[in-house]
Amino acid sequence: MTEQLIVRDEILIGANSQKVWEVLTKPKYIAEWDELPENYPNEDMTEGSKVIWELPNGGQSITKIIRAVVQKELKIALNVSNWEVKPNEGDVAYNYQLKEKGDSTLLKIEIGDFSLIKDGKMYYDASVEFASDSKQIIKKLSENLG
């Protein structure tokens, strides 16, 4: 059995889950903590929403929201068209869980499982950095929503 490559991180945010949810699902905020294509529509992301990036090698990187439980959980499947092995939808994903803690929200982030794909360690390492950086921006944006 291959060791799982799942990034796990969390942060306590001094804002309620409604504000954190807005930062996770509104493109104007997402663009500050993640990349969006230039022409992405300014509609809230919901279950079924997709973001498609054209890759320099001719492939596509596609993210699709496969679960959206408002103010509780957001699961975004990742698929890259030129991966040699195609995992099942959702087996490689970004998962954001929100838990109310009084006036604050605990945001738990899980990204992976990258052991299912070739060069998974490279994706894992990049995702460790992404989780660390993005959680700080999500915290700042959520706490400044007022």
Language-model features: where?
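Glycine-centered tight beta-turn/hairpin loop motif at sheet-sheet or coil-to-beta transitions
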Residues: 4, 56-58
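A conserved amphipathic terminal alpha-helix motif
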Residues: 87, 112-146
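Hydrophobic pocket/interface hotspot
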Residues: 20-24, 30, 51, 65, ...
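Generic structural detector for well-ordered beta-strands
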Residues: 10-12, 52-54, 64, 97
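Hydrophobic-ligand binding "helix-grip"
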Residues: 59-104, 112
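Hydrophobic ligand-binding cavity/cleft-lining segments
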Residues: 1-41
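Short, hydrophobic/aromatic-rich segments at coil-to-beta transitions
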Residues: 44-52, 71-76
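A structural signal for short, well-ordered beta-strand segments
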Residues: 7-11, 96, 109-111
